[in-house]
Amino acid sequence: MKEFMIIKNFGPIENIEIELKKINIFIGEQGVGKSTIAKLYSCMQDIFLHFLILFDSNQKKIKMIFKRYGIHSYFKDDTYIEFHTISDFIVKYEKGKFKISHLEYDEEKMKIFIINLLGDSLEHSFNGAGLSRDSNFKDLPDKEKEIVVSNMRTSFYLPAERSLVGCASNSLYSIITAKVPLPKMLLEYLSFFEKAKNEYQEYEVPFLGLKFKASKDDDKILIGDKEIEFKYSSSGIQSIVPMLMIVDYCLNQDYFSSFALEEPEINLFPTNQLELIRFIISKINQEKGIENLIITTHSPYILSILNVSILAGKIMEMKPELTDDITTILKPEFHLSSSEIEVFSLGKQINGGTECESIIDSSTGMIKGNYLDAVSSIISTDFNKLNRLYIKILREQ
């Protein structure tokens, strides 16, 4: 079964219905609900949410899962949410209550399925936290409870605020243990960067030509023969290095099967955006553990990057005999199949609601050219008008 989600009257979202694929891109201006959709999706696929719906009727406790993502206040009296999972579960929120059903299982079979799934996840989570499986969850300190619960989830959120991590890379443990009042998503991000640093004392980012070196005193960045403190490196480096380390760590530990990335373009020059997106595509193609990726962005440039990968994959499928020609232009690890990507454009309607539409051309499987050209067309039009005015001035002199 394909994943799809219906959202009505939740935060800035009035009424949308979307079918989700392996890679899902949401593009639009600020405040139209891109992050709301990504965060809601992360919550709705949470095994722990499914468990609570089945075994706990306390709706306030269930909604605490949404508080982690800062969207708990988005629920309204007429909010309606419906989420269909790949494994045939249907999670609904209607008239102030969550419900869960299955296309084949009755309630008893659902409980058995979720308990078994949760049990495997719990054991893996205990091991990841360095705890004995015999430990009683209720007796664990709050910090260890938080680690266990976060490791049990299937989705990991990479927030836009991630660039703040670089400024405090050598104070992460203190920030986490001191319970500094930061958003839970950011604290979790900090926690996983701390784990990643312990795992990778040195970490290379080939497409940036640098190496990260973890240290108890001051983390370092090595670029060629030049070494600088990580906290004094560029904002782009501070944003991208922890993110890549965390993703690699999570994949190696088999923690999450789904990732949501906010604004990959943050603090990055276009060529670095290109390298980052292609790095992410290669991870998706190489790692069997990644089942789903959501990206929110403001950048049409990122769509152009993706379109090149889709086109390469399309030509490869149509004419395998042209493999050598295609791979000379773009390596196979950067190719995408149009069947595994969906791109949605979000915008504000006249009445203030959010409009969400697919911008994949159904006939070609590629991102619609008129959408990609829209921004450059506006810029070109303005430039041409100014250029004509400039030429007129020159002629009058």
Predicted segments with their positions:
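N-terminal pre-P-loop "Q-motif" helix
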Residues: 8-12, 239-242, 272
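Active-site/pore-lining binding-face segments in mid-to-C-terminal subdomains
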Residues: 43-45, 50, 267-356
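Phosphate-coordinating catalytic segments in nucleotide- and nucleic-acid-processing enzymes
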Residues: 19, 45-260, 332-397
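Walker B catalytic acidic pair
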Residues: 262-264
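Short hydrophobic/aromatic beta-strand immediately N-terminal to the Walker A/P-loop
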Residues: 24-27, 260, 294
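Pre-Walker A-like glycine/lysine-rich segment at the N-terminus of P-loop NTPase domains
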Residues: 1-43, 47
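Pre-Walker A (Motif I) flank of P-loop NTPase domains
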Residues: 21-23, 256, 291
